[in-house]
Regions:
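Short, well-formed alpha-helical segments that are part of the catalytic scaffolds
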Residues: 7-26
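A conserved acidic beta->alpha catalytic loop
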Residues: 23, 33-46, 57-58, 84-88
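Catalytic-site signature of metal-activated, phosphate-bearing donor transferases
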Residues: 63-71, 89-215, 221
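Short beta-strand-to-loop acidic/aromatic patch adjacent to the donor-nucleotide binding site
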Residues: 71-88
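Conserved donor nucleotide-binding strand/loop of the catalytic core
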Residues: 43-72
Length: 354
């Protein structure tokens, strides 16, 4: 019979403990490395029967924390699930995992819901990769740690098993120094280089963002990460915005994001024909790629809203109305979308239907 373990480090997460435990208590083993909690996290977990070990990671690195937690997992475990305390397994998860895991599987890929829209529907989501066999794996990277294997891997995909993330509201943590350290350690690792470029963008250090992403583009052929690099370069170098966005749309025809960004650019320029065309092109992409670069806006209200506005200015009023309705359906609490739809309906009733 398959034996499954939950593992991970934690610190000062007492407010999450009960819901986290309730979601994963059907595991055979739950091993947690407490890295210095002072809010009762350790005591709450021990009271629930969780195996908690005190550890200190000095200097702090995420890979050392997760590897230490993984080493606490017994050798007779078949499948390991890294589950942070702000994450939840969904009801019936064990049966779904056992059904999805094949004899040859070494890592399971599953829908990971990273955040949630205001109406409770999934926001950003992608195929997670933190469920793996017990042998041969370790975490690598001071931050944005990646799971690496010294053995050949076989990934199995499922849509039935999911992990949901419920992050605490907080400002961006300071990952920059750890990312710079990771790049110094692994200068030829394109994944870490891409994360560093993104962190420079978050902190609006645009010159370093552009330089880092350009280095990355010379290192990687990964279309997902290249798409994010190219669209971010459009922000870092506004004078080359169209070049970078069109390159992204050309290289990654599976993603809406570059096309929606182009439609938004032409909306701001009041170029309604191009805004209309790029919105249409974005909406022709109907298969969600399910990777971490996909934004809920591009796969929700935004292309419909842009198309509606462009159609209005091109006097295509029926299409304008249809797209305005769809945009509001996808973001029903948006006051501007409500006002736009009423304006369109009133105009059509007065001028075209009377």
């Amino acid at each position: 019979m398959m034996r499954i373990a939950i593992y991970g480090p934690t610190k000062n997460q007492a407010h999450h403990v009960q819901a986290w435990y309730d979601s994963c208590k059907d595991a055979d083993v739950i091993c947690i490395a407490d890295t210095g909690s002072t809010d009762g996290t350790k005591e709450a977990m021990l009271a629930l029967g969780v195996q908690v070990t005190d550890v200190r990671i000095i200097p702090w690195r995420f890979d050392d924390a997760f590897n230490t937690a993984m080493y606490l997992v017994p050798d007779d475990i078949d499948v390991c699930i890294r589950l942070d305390t702000d994450e939840r397994l969904t009801p019936g998860w064990r049966d779904k995992l056992e059904a999805a895991w094949k004899p040859e599987t070494t890592r399971l890929r599953y829908p990971y819901i990273w955040n949630w829209n205001a109406d409770g529907t999934p926001g950003r989501q992608w195929y997670g990769d933190r469920i793996h066999s017990r042998k041969g794996y370790r975490w690598m990277g001071a931050t944005h740690e990646g799971l690496v294997s010294r053995l050949p891997e076989i990934h199995t995909f499922t849509d039935d098993f999911q992990i949901h993330h419920f992050p605490d509201p907080k400002s961006k943590s300071g990952d920059l120094s750890l990312l710079e350290e990771s790049v110094r350690e692994w200068p030829h690792d394109s994944r870490i280089k891409a994360y560093l470029g993104r962190e420079y963008a978050y902190q609006k250090i645009w010159d370093k963002c552009a330089a880092t992403y350009k280095e990355f583009l010379g290192m990687s052929f990964d279309t997902v990460e290249r798409c994010q690099a190219l669209t971010t370069l459009a922000q870092a170098e506004p004078e080359n915005k169209l070049f970078w966005l069109k390159q992204a749309a050309y290289e990654v025809p599976t993603h809406r994001e570059p096309l929606v960004a182009l439609a938004q650019h032409y909306y701001e320029a009041a170029d309604w024909k191009n805004c209309y065309d790029y919105s249409h092109r974005a909406l022709k992409i109907t298969k969600h790629p399910m990777d971490y670069t996909c934004t809920p806006e591009a796969w929700g209200w935004q292309p419909h809203d842009l198309l509606s506005i462009a159609a209005w200015n091109l006097r295509l009023y029926d299409e304008c109305l249809e797209q305005a309705k769809t945009a509001l359906e996808k973001s029903p609490d948006d006051t501007r979308l409500k006002n736009n739809l009423k304006l369109i309906e009133d105009f059509i009733a007065k001028n075209l239907r009377g």
